[in-house]
Regions:
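N-terminal leader segment of winged-helix/HTH proteins
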Residues: 1-27
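Residues at secondary-structure transition points
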Residues: 3, 27, 31, 35, ...
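Short amphipathic alpha-helical/adjacent loop interface patches that line ligand
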Residues: 9, 16, 33, 106, ...
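N-terminal helix-turn-helix DNA-binding core of bacterial DNA-binding proteins
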Residues: 19-58
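Canonical helix-turn-helix DNA-binding module
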Residues: 45-89
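Charged, amphipathic alpha-helical coiled-coil/dimerization segments
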Residues: 70-122
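Terminal interaction helix/tail motif
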Residues: 103-148
Length: 148
């Protein structure tokens, strides 16, 4: 990849991360809190242990994260239907504050996407799907390497 393309890509990733941090702050959340909430909204309820693994947090920080999200009204703890001895964390609806805060960026990105042909759109979202898998695999490798 030419260096200018690499720089454009790095700027894009930085802009996405900075927007995530700004969005979290606007909703009075930490960046990790917003990330955890996004995980729950995308994958559904999970145990605190699973959430800790996905966020890279240990038990204590995961408990405090869940406490903050629960206190803010974004999640609730509920008995695990498969094992009543366990607790799961589940998102509660769609957070209105988050939707309000993210609406301008979503609208702008939607406008940009409407400028692409169906073929370009397909390539773009194929890339997003493949890059998601690549980043998740790379993150897992880093976690495994650091744990060992």
């Amino acid at each position: 990849m030419p260096s200018d393309a690499s720089e454009v890509y790095r700027r894009y990733l930085s802009a996405v991360m900075l927007h995530g941090h700004a969005s979290a702050k606007a909703c009075e959340l930490g960046a990790t809190d917003l990330y955890a909430l996004n995980i729950l909204q995308l994958t559904g309820p999970m145990t605190p242990g699973e959430l800790g693994t996905r966020t890279g947090l240990t038990t204590g920080p995961t408990t405090r994260l869940i406490d903050r999200l629960e206190q803010a009204g974004y999640v609730r703890r509920a008995p695990d239907p498969g094992d009543r001895r366990k607790v799961i964390v589940e998102p509660i609806g769609k957070p209105a504050d988050l939707d309000r805060v993210m609406a301008p960026a979503r609208q702008r990105i939607g406008e940009l996407l409407r400028g692409y042909s169906p073929e370009q759109f397909e390539v773009l979202f194929d890339y997003f799907a493949r890059a998601t898998d690549a980043y998740q695999e790379a993150a897992e490798q880093l976690r495994s390497h650091n744990a060992g």
